[in-house]
Curated annotation (Swiss-Prot):
Transmembrane intervals: 1-21, 37-57, 83-103, 104-124, 140-160, 183-203, 207-227, 260-280, 309-329, 365-385, 399-419
Transit peptide recorded as keyword: no
Organism (species): Chlamydia muridarum (strain MoPn / Nigg)
Keywords (A to Z) from UniProt: Cell membrane, Membrane, Phosphate transport, Transmembrane, Transmembrane helix, Transport
Example GO biological process: phosphate ion transmembrane transport
Keyword Nuclease: no
GO molecular function: phosphate transmembrane transporter activity
Protein topology in the membrane: Multi-pass membrane protein
Protein name: Putative phosphate permease TC_0064
Domain of life: Bacteria
Length: 426
């Protein structure tokens, strides 16, 4: 059945391409919406870190989706039905994401693939096939992720306003606090890497923790040095076209000189956040495309399945994410970055930091959560800190509706593809 494996691998790349086109907005949309990065710069940064996240941490979440929802055991589900079911789930996800991306809907790719996996399990009418406890845990994480993301974003932005923006001298306050913010970012990323087990493959935990602490100290010192060396606290006399300051000024004429300096420093911190978010997104969402491929390969060739094979599949998924965001990612980036609420670097920083911590932590513990839920929750948290009038409720309604539609749509498409495969090959 090598021909089926070839089709599945192509389908995995196709699905990863659509994931990159739809879900990349969660990683870089706030940076583009805040004017920190151009679309070209955002694609370049995301391409590098999405791929790294996919190949370094993606295998943990792959294990949850591949074998944690539907059992391929011989006495419960036949090998042929499992292969057909995973193939159906894969193509159902790709088709639905392509439809959503065409209309600019920021749907949850995790919803789509889990809906697809559950779809073929339900059509078999074998209740024992589906691990409902795993499904319940995943659904709870989906409900909790926007609440947690929004709560942290609200707290972070409220702190920024009180400790920096509302101060009599916001520039001095920003210069004092910026090193601590960068240190927290680096510590969070390092801690997530340690908890995920990825670093443990190379060095022992005590050594890894000491390295992280060293990087935190370096980030703190480098920020102090960088702010003064690059004169970030002083505005230049002339603003060149196409520069960061030019983009910030083009977004709003309400910036005073002091606030423009503050937002400029936040912009550089937000670039770090964009890298963190891209890494976290790649580590979590590559599983949505590669888990069915890995599951089918394991069912067809159990003797040759190995970590090396899984690494090849993860690399393929990472490349698919990169091509998707480079060719079609702008549609949903526009929705996330510009249509929900007005973002500035300080607001985008709050969204990015809270989202990155939530998503990467979930990936480290093997929970396939929805990055869309987390980011939208974080954007809502920042918006609510400014008042309900700052939020585009019509867009929020459309996004929430897409959350409810995606699971049944993925299941329905999966059932259709599953029955089609059975009719053709059985």
């Amino acid at each position: 059945m090598w021909w089926l494996l070839v089709c599945v691998v192509i389908g995995g790349f196709y699905t990863a391409w659509n994931i990159g086109a739809n879900d990349v907005a969660n990683a870089v949309g706030p940076s583009v919406g805040a004017g920190v990065l151009t679309l070209r710069q955002a694609v370049l940064i995301a391409a590098v870190f999405e791929f790294l996240g996919a190949v370094v941490l993606g295998d943990r979440v792959i294990g949850t989706i591949e074998s944690g929802l539907v059992a391929p055991a011989d006495h419960v589900l036949s090998s042929q039905d499992y292969v057909f079911g995973m193939t159906a789930a894969l193509f159902a996800t790709g088709v639905w994401l392509q439809i959503a991306s065409f209309f600019g809907w920021p749907v949850s790719t995790t919803h789509a693939i889990v809906g697809g996996v559950l779809g073929f399990g339900i059509i078999l009418k074998e209740d024992a096939v589906i691990y409902w406890d795993s499904c319940a845990r995943i659904f709870v994480s989906w409900l909790a992720s926007p609440i947690i993301g929004g709560y942290f974003a609200f707290l972070i932005f409220s702190f920024i306003r009180k400790a920096i923006l509302y101060k009599r001298d916001p520039v001095s306050a920003m210069v004092r606090i910026a090193p601590f913010l960068s240190a927290i970012i680096i510590f969070a990323l390092g801690l997530i890497l340690i908890l995920s087990g990825a670093v443990a493959r190379v060095v022992a935990f005590p050594v890894a923790f000491r390295v992280v602490c060293g990087l935190v100290v370096f980030a703190f010192a480098f920020t102090i040095w960088g702010v003064h060396f690059f004169k970030l606290a002083v505005l230049p006399q002339k603003v060149g076209p196409g520069t960061l300051l030019d983009r910030l000024l083009s977004k709003s004429t309400d910036y005073g000189r002091q606030y423009l300096v503050v937002e400029r420093i936040f912009a550089y911190l937000q670039i770090v956040i964009a890298c963190f978010m891209s890494f976290a997104h790649g580590s979590n969402d590559v599983a949505n495309a590669i888990a069915p491929v890995a599951g089918i390969y394991r069912a067809l060739y159990p003797q040759s399945y190995s970590p090396k094979v899984l690494f090849i599949f993860m690399s393929l998924g990472g490349l698919g994410l990169v091509f998707g965001l480079a060719t079609w990612g702008w549609r949903v980036i526009d929705t996330i970055g510009k249509k929900i609420t007005e973002l500035t670097p300080s607001r985008g920083f709050s969204v990015g930091m809270s989202s990155a911590i939530t998503i990467a932590a979930a990936s480290a513990f093997g929970f396939p959560i929805s990055t869309t839920h987390v980011v939208v929750g974080a954007v809502l948290g920042v918006g609510l800190a400014r008042g309900l009038q700052a939020i585009n409720l019509r867009i929020i309604k459309d996004i929430v509706l897409s959350w409810f539609v995606t699971v049944p749509a993925g299941a329905a498409l999966s059932i259709m593809f599953f029955l089609l495969l059975r009719a053709v090959f059985c």
